[in-house]
Amino acid sequence: MKIMGILGIQGDLEEHEDAVRKVNCIPKRIRTVDDLDGIDALIIPGGESTTIGKLMVSYGFIDKIRNLKIPILGTCAGMVLLSKGTGKEQPLLEMLNVTIKRNAYGSQKDSFEKEIVLGGKKVHAVFIRAPQVGEILSKDVEIISKDDGNIVGVKEGNIMAISFHPELSEDGVIVYEYFLKNFVEKN
């Protein structure tokens, strides 16, 4: 069984762990850089990206994650953290050749749920203060999902990033299946 690490600084950790189990993988909560050893993939969950970034710096995660050679899935704030820039001064991993529009859909009260398509399958997506891709900086970045023309899912190399919370919807497991099939099992 594959082991999927879930960065345990902030976010819906239990919900991600449940989804990982549903795709027959073992979840491992990552709280220290040493916890990264032995995992087959990493999930960077949602939360508040500036806070997560600062904590990643404090705990020594930035360089360690940048040097991982495993698939990484970023959801919501995880997408922000993987990006090259947001127009705001904040710590980023800078591993994904996109810029991000933070909170592109508005504030917490503007959060919504909507059906989108990912990998040819419909997914009930939960958008909470969700980002969007602003600019694609490399031809290696592939769009994997859109919402009314706005880019909400991309992949590049062994990195996948989405602006919504798959862990919060029943059929969000489709996202984890897609990540497992197209990234983790191919690594």
From Swiss-Prot:
Residues binding L-glutamine, per UniProt: G47, E48, S49, R102, I128, R129
Pathway note: Cofactor biosynthesis; pyridoxal 5'-phosphate biosynthesis
UniProt GO MF annotations: glutaminase activity; pyridoxal 5'-phosphate synthase (glutamine hydrolysing) activity
Catalytic function, reaction form: aldehydo-D-ribose 5-phosphate + D-glyceraldehyde 3-phosphate + L-glutamine = pyridoxal 5'-phosphate + L-glutamate + phosphate + 3 H2O + H(+); L-glutamine + H2O = L-glutamate + NH4(+)
Keyword Iron-sulfur attached: no
GO BP term, pick one: glutamine catabolic process
Subunit structure: In the presence of PdxS, forms a dodecamer of heterodimers. Only shows activity in the heterodimer.
Task of the protein: Catalyzes the hydrolysis of glutamine to glutamate and ammonia as part of the biosynthesis of pyridoxal 5'-phosphate. The resulting ammonia molecule is channeled to the active site of PdxS.
Family, per entry: Belongs to the glutaminase PdxT/SNO family.
Protein name according to UniProt: Pyridoxal 5'-phosphate synthase subunit PdxT
Annotated organism of origin: Methanococcus maripaludis (strain C7 / ATCC BAA-1331)
Origin organism lineage: Archaea, Methanobacteriati, Methanobacteriota, Methanomada group, Methanococci
